[in-house]
């Protein structure tokens, strides 16, 4: 058989409610003393640990960004320096090429002037030698003409003979 006070919802009494509230309050106090504070301590530790990990990660990221910026700067500077070196080398090569061309032109002009000078000197020497030979030939012919009283034909033959001998001497 069922007893009426054991059936749920059969009767509401303030004593039962008060006892339930009192037991609940004691349970809350015990939970707060023995479980809540240690649980909150663990939670606080966890929060601080996570916060320090986040700070460390942000610091690492900031350092990485700074290093990346520095590396980009160094790379850009290296590019600029290499470009400058290339330009300097091109300019130096161009100057050397121009200097070589100028030197070659001066040398060719000098050789050309020497050749002209040699040609002129040889020409003068040849003319001088020819004048001497013509002069001595004229004297020789004149002496032969004086020795022999020649007519025009003999005189022409004599001149031709001396000219041929002169050509053979060379």
Curated annotation (Swiss-Prot):
Location of the protein in the cell: Cell membrane
Record-annotated membrane-spanning stretches: 11-31
Gene Ontology cellular-component annotations: plasma membrane; proton-transporting ATP synthase complex
Chief place of localization: membrane
Record's bilayer topology term: Single-pass membrane protein
GO molecular function term, any single one: proton-transporting ATP synthase activity, rotational mechanism
UniProt KW keywords: ATP synthesis, Cell membrane, CF(0), Hydrogen ion transport, Ion transport, Membrane, Transmembrane, Transmembrane helix, Transport
Function per UniProt: F(1)F(0) ATP synthase produces ATP from ADP in the presence of a proton or sodium gradient. F-type ATPases consist of two structural domains, F(1) containing the extramembraneous catalytic core and F(0) containing the membrane proton channel, linked together by a central stalk and a peripheral stalk. During catalysis, ATP synthesis in the catalytic domain of F(1) is coupled via a rotary mechanism of the central stalk subunits to proton translocation. Component of the F(0) channel, it forms part of the peripheral stalk, linking F(1) to F(0).
Quaternary data: F-type ATPases have 2 components, F(1) - the catalytic core - and F(0) - the membrane proton channel. F(1) has five subunits: alpha(3), beta(3), gamma(1), delta(1), epsilon(1). F(0) has three main subunits: a(1), b(2) and c(10-14). The alpha and beta chains form an alternating ring which encloses part of the gamma chain. F(1) is attached to F(0) by a central stalk formed by the gamma and epsilon chains, while a peripheral stalk is formed by the delta and b chains.
Entry similarity comment: Belongs to the ATPase B chain family.
The name this protein goes by in its record: ATP synthase subunit b
Organism: Listeria monocytogenes serotype 4b (strain F2365)
